[in-house]
């Protein structure tokens, strides 16, 4: 909607929409770097990445911080944390539809050598065959430590969006 509005108001603009989870993956990289090195990154924007793929199925084929290649640090971390994943201090995958432990992301990195840059629940949607090992049944999803968007959440979200639209139109 935002990009569509930009083109409507300013047709000459060169813009594209990108899932915000790319930025979330930069924050995960920051956390892993800090945990592994003990050095603090003041701003996750200082992590430079090259993004490839399509919306909700995006990948980093390059990631660096101050000229330091983050792939070896990420590789080491994914090997050491393939079972428990990465947990951001204030978030827990078990309490939220939209959180995850990034274990699918780690698994895909070990398989393909690129950093998956979307949430685990989006990544598995694009992985028929391979994805079956992630989505086989509720116990499998739980083992991979990511949440699925529930029908109840979708219904509630729709009602909230419709109410907001009505308020804005009034």
PLM features: residue spans?
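Class I S-adenosyl-L-methionine
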Residues: 4-7, 30, 34
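Long, compositionally biased stretches enriched for glycine and/or charged residues
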Residues: 34-170
């Amino acid at each position: 909607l935002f990009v569509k509005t930009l083109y409507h108001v300013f047709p000459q603009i060169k813009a594209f929409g990108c899932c915000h989870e790319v930025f979330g993956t930069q924050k995960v990289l920051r956390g892993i770097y800090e945990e592994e090195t003990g050095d603090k990154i003041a701003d996750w924007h200082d992590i430079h990445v090259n993004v490839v793929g399509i919306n909700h199925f995006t990948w980093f084929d390059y990631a660096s911080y101050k000229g330091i290649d983050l792939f070896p640090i990420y590789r080491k971390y994914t090997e050491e944390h393939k079972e428990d994943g990465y947990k951001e201090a204030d978030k827990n995958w078990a309490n939220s539809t939209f959180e995850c432990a990034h274990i699918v992301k780690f698994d895909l990195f070990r398989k393909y050598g690129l950093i998956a840059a979307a949430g685990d629940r989006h990544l598995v949607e694009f992985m028929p065959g391979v994805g079956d090992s992630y989505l086989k049944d509720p116990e499998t999803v739980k083992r991979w430590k990511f949440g699925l968007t529930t029908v109840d959440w979708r219904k509630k979200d729709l009602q909230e969006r419709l109410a907001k639209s009505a308020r804005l139109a009034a």
